[in-house]
């Protein structure tokens, strides 16, 4: 599903990624562990080209996505990414956050996107928060909404960048439970 070959990433003279090779099969779960500043987030951001690698190749679903001709926005539709600080739009309701991308990218009409969002909210026990704004949610709720927002695009793979690091210890379990369910269902 994802193949990384001789991946390098530098910021000026600082080489953060030094020749990474990795092969991730469909349904496989990979955890990248290392100290702060070791390049974990940079690696994840390179996988969907939020960061442009200095050199090397990344293949996703049989396509070389580091090829300049690749429509990376099209590729990203199949890669969900959840960040450590939620990145929800504060001016939109929970429902608006979840349905924005599927509607804007014309993957679903508004009615379909709303139905899909409500189904996903049911799944994580937060349907009652559909009309709430992010400022009204706990950290754990915000992160579960961020996961659902990515799932609303029906991705083939989910990338999680320290999804529990910004949470209070008592909120971590809520988010990990959603991640365990995804793993059990075979999400890569």
Can you say where each PLM-predicted feature lies in the sequence?
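ABC family nucleotide-binding domain
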Residues: 1-188
């Amino acid at each position: 599903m994802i193949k990384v070959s001789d991946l390098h990433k530098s910021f000026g003279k600082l080489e953060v990624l030094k020749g990474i090779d990795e092969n991730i099969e469909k349904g496989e779960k990979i955890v990248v562990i290392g100290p702060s500043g070791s390049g974990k987030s940079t690696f994840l951001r390179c996988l969907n080209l939020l960061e442009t690698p200095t050199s090397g190749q990344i293949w996703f679903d049989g396509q070389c996505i580091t090829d300049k001709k690749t429509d990376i926005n099209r590729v990203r539709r199949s890669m969900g990414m959840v960040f450590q600080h939620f990145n929800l739009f504060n001016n939109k309701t929970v429902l608006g956050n979840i349905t924005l991308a599927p509607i804007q990218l014309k993957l679903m009409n508004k009615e379909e996107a709303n139905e899909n969002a409500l189904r996903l909210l049911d799944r994580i026990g937060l349907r009652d928060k559909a009309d709430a704004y992010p400022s009204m949610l706990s950290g754990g709720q915000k992160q579960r909404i961020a996961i659902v927002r990515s799932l609303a695009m029906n991705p083939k793979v989910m990338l999680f960048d320290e999804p529990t690091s910004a949470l209070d210890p008592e909120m971590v379990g809520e988010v990990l439970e959603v991640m365990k369910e995804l793993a059990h269902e075979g999400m890569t």
